[in-house]
A protein has these predicted regions:
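Loop-helix junctions at membrane interfaces
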Residues: 2-5, 13-224
C-alpha cells in the first residue's frame, strides 16, 4: 500500500566534506539537523499559540471555561513529521507562549490541562502511525489518539485539574455550570461523563478531520 503520510525526521548523525580553497572542511550535520528542527519547533509552536485565540464555545456540552479550538493541529503536524517527542515539546511551548502573552484566567490550570491532553493526543497518534503509514493507518492512529487523550482528560480533570480549578472558583459553582447544561450533572464524576467526555471527543475528532484535510498540502513545509 502506498504511504499517505511520511515521517521524514532523520535518525542519527554523520559528516560530509565540502572543498574550499583546495581543503576539505568537515561540517557536522548533527548541528544542522538540530538547527533545522528548532526552527520547525518554533514555527509550529507559534502557529499553535495563534490558533488558541480562535475559540468556539460548546455551550450545549461544556461550561464557559472549556472552549473548542484546533491548536493541537500544529502539535500533530510536528509529531507526524518529526516524531512523538517533538509533538510534546511543541505542546509545551505553545502553552508557555499562551501564559506569557495571552495570560490566564485559571491560574495556569487551563494551560496545564491543554498540555496534558494535547501531548497525549500527538504522542499516541504519531507513535502508532510510525508503523502503519497508510491512509487507513492514519485514521486508526488519530482515532487511537482521540480515545487516549479523552480517557486521560477525564482522569486528569477528575484528579488534578478540576480540584485545582476549585482553588480559583468554588467547586459548587463549577458543578452549577454543568447542571445548567444538563440536570444529569450533579457532581464532579457526572461532570466528567456528561461534559468532559463529549467535549474532548468533539475536539479530538474535529482536529483529526482538519489534519486529514490539510496534512498533505502543508506537511512538505516541515519535511526535510
Amino acid at each position: 500500500m502506498r504511504e499517505w503520510f511520511k515521517l521524514s525526521h532523520p535518525e542519527g548523525s554523520g559528516f560530509f566534506y565540502a572543498p574550499t580553497g583546495g581543503k576539505m572542511n568537515r561540517v557536522n550535520t548533527k548541528t544542522m539537523i538540530r538547527t533545522r528542527d528548532m526552527t520547525k519547533i518554533g514555527m509550529l509552536s507559534v502557529i499553535g499559540f495563534i490558533l488558541m485565540y480562535f475559540q468556539l464555545p460548546l455551550s450545549f456540552v461544556a461550561p464557559p471555561f472549556m472552549k473548542l479550538d484546533i491548536s493541537d493541529l500544529p502539535v500533530l503536524m510536528g509529531a507526524f513529521t518529526m516524531g512523538p517527542v517533538f509533538g510534546i515539546i511543541i505542546a509545551a511551548l505553545k502553552n508557555i507562549l499562551a501564559l506569557i502573552f495571552k495570560g490566564t484566567m485559571t491560574a495556569g490550570v487551563g494551560e496545564l490541562s491543554n498540555f496534558i491532553i494535547s501531548s497525549t493526543f500527538a504522542f499516541v497518534a504519531s507513535y502508532i502511525y510510525r508503523n502503519h503509514r497508510t491512509y487507513k493507518g492514519a485514521i486508526i492512529a488519530l482515532t487511537a489518539g482521540v480515545i487516549s487523550m479523552t480517557i486521560l482528560a477525564m482522569a486528569s480533570n477528575y484528579l488534578v485539574v478540576f480540584p485545582l480549578y476549585a482553588k480559583v472558583m468554588p467547586m459548587d459553582a463549577i458543578i452549577a455550570m454543568g447542571s445548567a447544561i444538563t440536570p444529569k450533572i450533579t457532581g464532579l464524576f457526572t461532570m466528567m461523563i456528561y461534559s468532559v467526555l463529549p467535549f474532548n471527543l468533539i475536539k479530538g475528532f474535529t482536529t483529526s478531520a482538519v489534519m486529514m484535510l490539510v496534512y498533505k498540502k502543508i506537511s512538505p513545509l516541515f519535511k526535510n
